[in-house]
């Protein structure tokens, strides 16, 4: 595969042992695909499949009026163009959505005619609300913020069988139950009680005997018994009787009487157990019937009603037990043949028969009435109501829907194959079969279902969740329409009079705005974005709750293999409930997770890839990805490690059906970014995966020297980099945009052959980190489709770069790295390695108040000129101003009501005039503890209010930028067109032209160069066809110009119209501050292996331990953090990183020395590096210039990839270390023989440490838990209303609570005065604290403590309990 534009600049050497059979699929495909099928916007209405919006509409329409004379039919829907694009919506705080219009048809029938005929039809497009659109990266912009809809893992619709594990009854008996779960509608449960009676319940209501349900669906006791039991046939004699002999029913039974053959010989003696030999003897004796004594019949249960043949009356009922009296009645009625139920204690229980005895209903109607009474207690059961309710429970498509998944699961579980034939409601057969399977389970046949099996849990994606909400909105609309349809005829209404779109908009808005599954996007870095979109949650509406979820649901299940990551899940209460999709996983049409496998054909592993769901997988034997294969693709070993039905085993190659696609198949994106994951303990790997998502983007991203090869995929798929949509040549590039002239073969005729990429500059993310894109192409570069043109936050040359490569030494250092603390060199801070930029958004609104409008102005009294000189004439801060806490950003004054004035104020007013007093200063100021630079200001003005100068200048800048884009496009299009025209004209004969060109002359290049290009069109060519081509070219150019003018005009209109602001708001101003955060003690840092710590000290570089050549370590970590945590991956990463940097230094040495800096030497060394181990790279396909550029980029480290579960071995690391540090270098640097440790020297004394230390490079991250965000101090601030104590927390500018235990501590020390001060004047003694403030101002430091307010609160509370408590003052 050829290298892409960015790949060949810095090739990552991979240690993978096997070639990739399949690339990692597009990581956001699930989200994008799901929403695409929901909208089907680009599909013509006639071709739309019945899913998403189409399905929702067709399930509700047509709506028929109560009298049936009018109906509203749905024809089609269309989605309009969104008014604002994504960026504009984010700036203005709007939702990125497009208007939905449905074409509906109102059909009125004629009342007068006997058979229904159509009187009139009205068709109209009706507005149905706005549907939010997904951005290209799988998120939604709702009210200006980016949100993600997380997929939900819920229990699949279908039928499930389980037991209570013996927990319900004290005896520990297993009580079996079955549950039919529809997609929407009532749940139907069946359950056994401890007495083996079978009950059913609907929607978890009161339970009733299951035979009531069977009678309600039209069965009689006889047919019920016939369905569930086999019969024994008896012939009654005057004494005793004859039973039909069925051998298998007698085996293992105890003989209760002598069984004799026809010849009178005893075959089985009384009280002997009947065995196989007895049965053979009986068969040989040709016994058809066995004579039984009278007692043998007692206790048996009749299978059918027995009717007296003469009178026709019922002598005995089905399900009656045979007693003496029943037998004598039967004999009296001359009945010879009877049938009884065949039951035994082992595997034919009499459960249904017992249930039938507890059931008192007589017939079908009575049964349905009983069900009605359970569902609607207290309502009178009329016949119609009873029928209607029963139909609506399980048989009506409006109220009950199994869905395609549910029907498929029901059919496959009840043994009808996996097709989805059958209605989407329940049928009587379904109910009967379910009960039958449940009885079989109780009889000991069959298996219960595993609820945590991924074949029984499915994923609801964005599209499906949105469709459910949309349907809910439509149902509300349907009710309103039904009522109004009756009037449609009389009042001559149109469809839009009937439909009110408010309920739909409300349902959609509620879902996207406040549903539990609609989450504020985690945008700390590209990885956290991508992980958030691939998350699968078991919580949410219709899912589990944290409190009720047990251990089993949270645990890793064998079916997670390749579908859900076993590592990445949060620590804490959500553990195991929130998961991440595995790298290669995808959803099938039913919403079940599938994972790819390579098919094995005739013993050879082929490249054919099949996706299997958890259910399908259980039928196959699947080999691991690391099984050894020969060149033909056959297994080398006699026994191969495989998985079958969740168990691991060794088996012969001939039995294997499939093989894993890749070793990284089982983990998620975040876990697949951890090198040497296979050497880390699972708990630490979990922390490592989670902490990568919290890494703050550094100022200068640096690629990890030790990666896994997934970095490029993540960076590109996350959408933070800019990819070329079409190939071409870079025409212009600057910090803000890249302009590309598209290749002719990729350009569609009639379209502009120019792509302009406007880069995102210094934009705030959801987590206040900085998003900024930097171009990495130069003018004249050729790029192909999909190449990376610009890096985003945390990406370096198109690869994910979350942290920095640091030189690590594992050694204790004066206790500064005790218990996971981290010692860092000052050089790291000085080089700005971990400096990050955070962007804060501060907003101020000017409202219309009762006393008049608030005003944004520079004219504020009592403000020093130093404060005002940052503001422009409109009272808004300049861009580029550096501000600190309490500086004014936007001047604002609010009118205040007239108050009683003190004499002094009256005097002042009399002297200085009115104006100064009737407004108060409510300006926007920088919050405490913040220092930064203003990088952007946005002004939003309500329609009808005059814009200030600042707002106008912002609009002018935006328009200038847009015009520049259009001019660039036009320039390139015109240049292309004129180049073609020039080729057409040169050498042609003319009839005349500008500058007195004579007839018959030929056109030369010099003549054309002399003319203005637009004059070329005035040349009259002699050749007619060419003249036509010239005319067409002129027309097309003029048309392009006209199109661009229209586009500019539209943009201008959009920008100059007033902004939509909340009611009562006149102006809104947003100021963006860029805050630079340097690394400091207290910041949290971590590696990728869960090795986290807090910076304890930043040490001068001269004090750090250094190597023999004087190189100081960047970070010193405690070696004791490794063994107990068992994350050895970090040590291997350090070794390999050490090799990577060493190889880079060797390349740098080669390039420095003129003798070795020739291309062939460089090629030879690179070949050694890239092609001694691993899969190898094609360095020889690169040109000499490309090889030298590659070498330049490799100078500070060759990037290595050690894929998960397929990484570098110890030998390979050793080989690389030898390449990196030849003997003379190793000697000079005082490395040990293994080259993994070095002798270090103490920076302060210069002495050698007493033993060598492991050194090397590790990719280390700075996490989003910064001490700046957490530190906070308060002098004076707000107090709580009731207790009058200071509030708590940084957000409230609160104090530090001096709690119960702290009071005890001071009591223990006897520090009475300190304690008094803490509990009174520093807390809630109101008069005392005011007095102290006065005293401090006067310079007199005296405390006058009084009564704390909380004591008064206590007294009041005691009084509220009607206990009169008073203070006695003396």
Swiss-Prot record:
GO terms for biological process: DNA-templated transcription. Its EC number is 2.7.7.6. It catalyses: RNA(n) + a ribonucleoside 5'-triphosphate = RNA(n+1) + diphosphate. The keyword 4Fe-4S does not apply. GO terms for molecular function: DNA binding; DNA-directed RNA polymerase activity; ribonucleoside binding. PROSITE patterns: RNA_POL_BETA. GO terms for cellular component: DNA-directed RNA polymerase complex. Keywords: DNA-directed RNA polymerase, Nucleotidyltransferase, Transcription, Transferase. The RNAP catalytic core consists of 2 alpha, 1 beta, 1 beta' and 1 omega subunit. When a sigma factor is associated with the core the holoenzyme is formed, which can initiate transcription. Belongs to the RNA polymerase beta chain family. PANTHER family: DNA-DIRECTED RNA POLYMERASE I SUBUNIT 2. NCBIfam families: PRK00405.1 (NF001616), rpoB (TIGR02013). DNA-dependent RNA polymerase catalyzes the transcription of DNA into RNA using the four ribonucleoside triphosphates as substrates. This is DNA-directed RNA polymerase subunit beta.
